[in-house]
Amino acid sequence: YHHPIGEVFFSFIPTLLRKKNDKIIFDLDDNTEYKLNEEDKKLKLTKEQNINLSKLNKVEKFSPSLIYGVTGSGKTEIYLQLAEKFILQNKSILILVPEINLIPQLEKRFKDRFNGDIGVYHSRQTPNQRLKVWLRSKFGGIRIVIGTRSSVMMPLKNLGAIIIDEEHDQSYKQAEGFKFSGRDLAIKRSQIENIPVFLGSATPSLQTLKLVKEKKFKKFDLLRRVDGKKPPKLIPLDISDSPLLGGIAIQTMSIIEATINKGEQVLIFLNRRGFAPLYECDNCGWVAKCSSCESNLVFHKSKNRLICHKCESVYGVNKTCPDCHSNEINTLGTGTERVEEVLRSSFKKVPIIRMDYDSTRLKGSI
């Protein structure tokens, strides 16, 4: 990656190990034994799962394997049974996920299956938490670790395989500091250590599909849902001529209202946190930008602050334009806070929960 070797090492070493520290105390006998919970394993595999699992279990060395499974096809059960195989061989396994908020559900599934400690490693943990998982992994205290891209170089003892869930996700790429792709590093590490690497996705990246076509990756299909149900119906809406209410089309609001009136729930996905992605002057066109990285600042109404989502710098809100001194400053665009505000105003008696980085960053908030 054309980076200084020290910066590369520091990217994957816990903060507390980056300087000499004689106060670190670690119990080398703090090992966990993994016992299989047979009650959790009673689930009967589908024909597709059985066929693919038998083939995947034969992969012993480096041979990138794409587990292409539609949503609900049982990829997680495949992960669990692959992990069981390596645990029984007294090996470790690393499971990578693209986002921190995907960890709790996967961690629960592994805890339900294995009676033993499941290591979790990500950037929102305290330095002590990360250090403990890192050291226990290195000395064999824990042999199952679930983590984000920062865990890709975890020094697991006797590593048997790496699983990359949602391999297509762009969150595996780090854009600041030492720039790298956790997905690509995991594949390269598997090649160097000559161990299996399994990539799971319902929507594989074009890069992966190209490698499958070139027969450099093997592909295992799970095309049917475990429950036998058909995929949900997708209805595209043409909102080009529709008035918007806080970024939501009138047709969409009508569908939300009809769904609520039937006593059902609604999930709304929006990939922008904050209130508005632009804070600008209507008079001269000035746009609030970060002085550190030149990125556009995002207005967060709940904090009354302008925040850079790239470097996390925080600024006060300008009452007047710094260029033309006009008071005509407005927000442009829609973020999760604006959508929440509109929905609360439209459906006053309906409980509404906003889940994004700002509302779920504290421990226990999810």
Language-model features and meaning:
Residues 42-47, 60, 72-76, 96, ...:
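Conserved phosphate/pyrophosphate-binding and hydrolysis machinery centered on Walker-type P-loop NTPases
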